[in-house]
């Protein structure tokens, strides 16, 4: 009998490793370049450039607004790191950048403590108020001639927790602290605009004078982001290009996705792990589909929505699965799909619907997220619609669709 230890040893020896730098697929990783966020970094630079003047007297404030996964945190972190370095190396100005997550530090006191810790500023053991700590921080910066940029990530959590007086103190700090040089500047990062616009006007007008919006990523932008991460994290030629196309089309905002780069990268990472587990030296489309069905929170909703489809929509979906299995391809032409649909309809003793109706069924299936469509490019004569399944080809899915078809047919009997 083979021991558990030997089984483990054999497994480790035979395992295929195609991800060489897994940390570069982590949500916390900030790469040296951020595709399609270069202009946002330039905007931040323009706002904070006055801090580089030797006689800078004023502080700056900016709101960063965008959905989760639109690159807000990574962009601000990269800006802060590079601005700090450029300020000292090229301008001889001392700038300290501090990034604070308000989900973990959602009170004025915790924020003041986190800033003090980042500055290595010793706080007396006797209890000090947050306001007193902020005054100590400013005095510390003044003595050392340092400008401080504080990025308050997930700032909405602070706004929902703190009282009006604490919010006012933080935002309008220099109404409370007398200073010739205002050394503390802020970057407020929020997911939703209403967290800012519900504030008292005296606070809102002060905080939202400058606003940088981060739109959801389009599919082409997600493709570039994923390609960059593949080059950083995977072995050469280890990820098939159609994997990147599939993930970027699934999550691209212009394709009906949420435009979330974080989930797109997570899907890529899991697809790599699935490929390694299966012993494949290359991440293939099926690995990406399996990863997507695990990660995508909408997948179960998609499957649940099948019960609401009518008979011919289900037959069309069944025809797509059958045609994909026959051709062993990842996508088929609209013509091939219609031929399979007509054949399958007759097997069920159903009159096939006309082309315009079939196209409308296809549009409905795309809206609920179970199929993808695209226009053919080079390599095909003429322009045609190519159709693919957004979920892995799975017998359980096929059986469920067949079950739903039989339910519809029996209800007619």
From Swiss-Prot:
Post-translational modification: Autophosphorylated in vitro.
SUPFAM superfamilies linked to this entry: P-loop containing nucleoside triphosphate hydrolases, Winged helix' DNA-binding domain
Molecular function per GO: ATP binding; ATP hydrolysis activity; DNA binding
UniProt keyword terms in alphabetical order: ATP-binding, DNA replication, DNA-binding, Nucleotide-binding
UniProt domain comment: The C-terminal WH domain is essential for its stimulating effect on the MCM-loading activity.
Record's subunit section: Monomer. Interacts with Cdc6-3, MCM and PolB1.
Record-given protein name: ORC1-type DNA replication protein 2
Lineage: Archaea, Thermoproteota, Thermoprotei, Sulfolobales, Sulfolobaceae
């Amino acid at each position: 009998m083979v021991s558990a230890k030997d089984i483990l040893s054999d497994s480790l020896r035979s395992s295929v490793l195609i991800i060489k730098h897994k940390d570069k697929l982590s949500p916390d990783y900030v790469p040296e370049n951020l595709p399609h966020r270069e202009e946002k970094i330039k905007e931040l630079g323009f706002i904070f450039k006055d801090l580089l003047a030797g006689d800078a007297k004023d502080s700056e404030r900016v709101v960063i607004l965008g959905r989760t996964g639109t690159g807000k945190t990574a962009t601000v972190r990269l800006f802060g790191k590079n601005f700090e370095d450029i300020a000292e190396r090229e301008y001889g100005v001392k700038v300290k950048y501090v990034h604070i997550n308000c989900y973990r530090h959602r009170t004025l006191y915790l924020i003041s403590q986190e800033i003090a810790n980042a500055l290595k500023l010793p706080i007396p053991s006797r209890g000090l108020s947050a306001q007193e700590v902020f005054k100590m921080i400013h005095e510390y910066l003044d003595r050392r001639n340092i400008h401080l940029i504080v990025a308050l990530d997930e700032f909405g959590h602070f706004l929902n927790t703190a009282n009006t007086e604490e919010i006012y103190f933080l935002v309008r700090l220099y109404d409370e602290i007398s200073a010739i040089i205002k050394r503390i500047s802020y970057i407020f990062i929020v997911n939703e605009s209403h967290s800012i616009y519900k504030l008292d006007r005296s606070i809102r007008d002060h905080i939202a004078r400058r606003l940088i919006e981060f739109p959801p990523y389009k599919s082409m932008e997600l493709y570039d982001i994923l390609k960059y991460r593949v080059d950083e994290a995977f072995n050469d030629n280890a990820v098939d290009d159609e994997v990147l196309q599939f993930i970027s089309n699934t999550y691209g905002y212009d394709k009906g996705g949420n435009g979330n780069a974080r989930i797109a990268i997570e899907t890529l990472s899991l697809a790599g792990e699935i490929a390694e587990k299966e012993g494949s030296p290359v991440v293939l489309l099926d690995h990406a589909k399996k990863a997507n069905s695990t990660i995508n929170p909408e997948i179960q909703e998609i499957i649940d929505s099948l019960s609401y489809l009518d008979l011919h929509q289900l037959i069309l979906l069944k025809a797509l699965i059958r045609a994909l299995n026959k051709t062993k391809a990842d996508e088929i032409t609209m013509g091939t799909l219609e031929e399979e649909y007509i054949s399958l309809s007759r097997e069920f003793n159903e009159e096939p619907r006309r082309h315009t109706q079939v196209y409308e069924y296809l549009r409905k299936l795309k809206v609920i997220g179970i199929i993808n469509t695209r226009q053919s490019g080079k390599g095909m004569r003429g322009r045609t619609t190519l159709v693919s399944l957004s979920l892995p080809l799975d017998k359980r899915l096929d059986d469920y669709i067949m079950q739903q078809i039989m339910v519809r047919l029996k209800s007619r009997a």
